[in-house]
Amino acid sequence: ELDIEHAAVVGGTVAVSDDVKNAVDTLLVANGGAVSLRWFGDDRYATAVDVAENGVDAGIAAFTYVGVATGENYPDALAGGVGAGVQGGVVALTATNALSGATQAMLEDHAATILYLDVFGGPAAVADVVRTAIAEALGW
C-alpha cells in the first residue's frame, strides 16, 4: 500500500481522461487523502507553466532555477527535468524556433526571482533566436 494523500493529474482531459483522474481520486480517498488536482493549460507549453506555478505554490519547487527545453520532443525536457528537480526548480517548454507565449510570460512575471536558467539541448532543439528571447524576457 502506498501512503499517498495528494496527487496532481498533469494534462487536460484530452491527455488524461476523467476516468483516469477518477481512478486516482478513488485511490486517494480510500487512503484518507483528498481528490487530485488537475494541472493543465491550453497546450503543452501552457501546461508546463501551470505545473511550474502550481509546484511553486505547493512549496515543492521555486522559480530561482528554471530549465527550458523544446516542447517539440521529450528527451531534453525529460533528462533536464531531473536536474531541475534536484535544484528545486521548474521546467518550461518552448518551440524550437520561437519562444512560446506562455513561457515568455512566465519568465517575465518571475524575472526578479530567477537566479539561474539552463537551456536543455543544443541549437537544433532550442534555436539561438529563442535563447536571445529568453535573455530579453529576463532582462539579462
What residues fall within each predicted segment?
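Extracellular glycan-binding segments that recognize GlcNAc-based cell-wall polysaccharides
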Residues: E1-W140
